[in-house]
A protein has these predicted regions:
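Short, charged, amphipathic alpha-helical segments
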Residues: 79, 83-87, 127-131, 151-155
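Long, amphipathic alpha-helical coiled-coil segments characteristic
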Residues: 37-83
Length: 174
């Protein structure tokens, strides 16, 4: 049943009538029962593990596409290849850290920033910097470098970020 508020204004005239819809939320929430927390957590962890396997399979396709697009840009300097490369890298980096590949996220972020900045300035991106980023991604994928990797992996990522910082003036390292 809906409740209403009739407000009296000075002089006996009614002001506005407010209608309050019924609150049915409480009836939708169970008062007891449901899965025990440890089972719900175990199921959620299993789902994440399944998604991780899907991500790794998808990553293989993405890496092949990155390689193809870099080769296409190398041969033709086709700006469409760069736009597609940006899209693929942007998608890869978005989920990489969630599934244990933060280095892919960092390298992808660096390359995406570089490509965006060059486009905004109307400048042609340097092939060498694109290739170095793509090669780093290939190594991370091929060697299955998860987590923050070893010191060489970290130094490589920092080196790529510094190169992009020099080219763009944008801060990547914090």
């Amino acid at each position: 049943m809906q409740q209403s508020d009739d407000k009296q204004q000075a002089g006996g005239k009614k002001k506005a009538k407010g209608i309050r819809p019924p609150n049915k939320l409480a009836s939708k929430v169970p008062k007891q029962g449901g899965k025990p927390a440890h089972l719900a957590i175990a199921e959620a962890e299993q789902r994440v593990e399944n998604l991780k396997e899907e991500y790794i399979a998808h990553l293989k396709d993405d890496m092949a596409e990155v390689e193809e697009l870099v080769a296409r840009y190398t041969d033709s300097r086709d700006p469409k290849a760069l736009k597609l490369l940006f899209r693929v890298i942007h998608n890869m980096r978005g989920q990489a850290a969630t599934f244990g590949y933060p280095l892919i996220t960092q390298v992808g972020r660096s390359l995406c920033l570089y490509l965006l900045e060059q486009e905004e300035k109307g400048e042609t991106p340097e092939l060498l910097l694109i290739t170095l980023h793509a090669d780093a991604l290939k190594v991370i994928y091929r060697e299955q470098i998860m987590g923050s990797g070893d010191s060489i992996s970290q130094e490589t990522v920092i080196g790529l970020m510094k190169a992009v910082e020099l080219k763009t003036g944008e801060k990547l390292l914090r």
